[in-house]
């Protein structure tokens, strides 16, 4: 991936090369532009394409929310599985974050100097991983996927994707920000990635599988796309 600043608008432009035929532009949260381009297209062609869309970018940029910036302080609102929680920040014996037995979202700090953001995100990773593991158990059974096909699941910060599947190795990655989204959206992403074990790319066969296993996947996808990213 390469990054440059468009001189006409001042927007950050992220360029991702893929085996596609055309150049596509997308407006992302945080007032940035994502360009997916064919691998053989020159950087000059990409820059010219962005420059030719200045009016379009300016129009749609006004509709995109600013990137959410958290301070990780008591009372700040965070979402877990689509539900809003006021954060409680406490001092305790060890650094950790999660939902308490009383249903409260807590960030526990060993000292006031502890890295709040890192501790919070680590706690959210654990929460999301547990949910995704449950989804894998449910859907690998329904889709008759052998356990040996799944070799690893990781959670990481992903700015432009919700998940990825390496079908050859059986390794999956999911965006940490999914922890803020409703469970039905998380399930849709899991099924999406599992379908890639049977169909590479987004072919007609792939979408036939999605329709078979999750008939309302488009509705779930629209809901997911409508929600702002929080943990990126």
How would you name each of these model-derived features?
Residues 193:
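Walker B catalytic acidic pair
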Residues 1-188, 197-232:
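Active-site-proximal or metal-binding-adjacent scaffold patches in catalytic folds
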């Amino acid at each position: 991936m390469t990054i440059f600043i468009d001189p006409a608008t001042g927007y950050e432009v992220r360029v991702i090369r893929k085996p596609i035929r055309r150049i596509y532009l997308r407006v992302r949260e945080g007032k940035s532009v994502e360009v997916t381009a064919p691998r053989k297209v020159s950087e000059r062609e990409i820059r010219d394409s962005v420059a030719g869309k200045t009016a379009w970018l300016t129009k749609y940029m006004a509709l995109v929310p600013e990137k959410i910036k958290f301070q990780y302080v008591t009372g700040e609102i965070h979402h877990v599985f689509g539900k809003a929680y006021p954060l409680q920040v406490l001092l305790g014996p060890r650094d950790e974050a999660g939902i308490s037995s009383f249903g409260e979202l807590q960030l526990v700090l060993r000292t006031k100097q502890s890295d709040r953001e890192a501790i919070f995100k680590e706690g959210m990773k654990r929460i999301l991983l547990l949910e995704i593991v449950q989804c894998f158990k449910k859907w690998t059974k329904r889709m008759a996927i052998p356990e040996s096909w799944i070799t690893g699941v990781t959670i990481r910060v992903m700015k432009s994707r919700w998940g990825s599947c390496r079908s050859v190795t059986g390794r999956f990655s999911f965006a940490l920000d999914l922890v803020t989204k409703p469970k039905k959206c998380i399930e849709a992403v899991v099924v999406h990635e599992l379908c890639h074990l049977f169909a590479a790319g987004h072919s007609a066969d792939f979408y036939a599988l999605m329709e078979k296993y999750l008939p309302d996947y488009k509705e779930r996808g629209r809901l997911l796309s409508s929600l702002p990213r929080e943990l990126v």
